[in-house]
Amino acid sequence: MQIVNAQDLTPLDSLYHQDSLTFGQRALLKPIQTWQHFSYGQSALNCQFEKSCSNFMVQAVLEKGVLRGTVIGTDRIVRCNSAARHYHLQNPHSKIQYDGRLVDPLEWKSEPAPGKSPLLATSLSIIPGLGRAYAGHPVDGLFSFLLVAGFAYNTYGHIKADNPIRTGINASFMTLFWLADFYGAYRTAKMVPPKFPQP
């Protein structure tokens, strides 16, 4: 029997030991659990969102499935940047928790007649980050572009070096961040209020 100090526990610790988790969920949640053990002791790594990005990812995976949940959680990681508060406060439905964290639930509220075209935003994401920029979040778009381009560059380098394992890992991350960019552009466009609100 392992004795664990209560202060060392993270929200994922008790969940990870449940029998109801699938193999895929366990495989994905283990790195998140490891991250929580590291980050929860570092005040500089406190998340500006409520739920934290790691707990948001866990919730997304459990409620939306491994693939869709991972894409949704990865979108949140991209959005957790220096412009997050500014973008959050532009949303008429935004909420701030008592401790100043940004309330960003998994189920978000879309505008019935959004001010930006979700179809165009999603289509523009063929070039990573462009759809987010079109939807009014250029900083998110820049982060998304840098992540997708960085992993694409690494993938190309590992292909040239004939390293199939690193090629596969980098290509997987490139694809994940690119899929998250499509989702994020769509989500952002759906949340943009109309320019001229209906009377």
Q: What do these predicted ranges mean?
A:
Residues 7-14:
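Bulky hydrophobic segments
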Residues 14-199:
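Hydrophobic alpha-helical membrane segments
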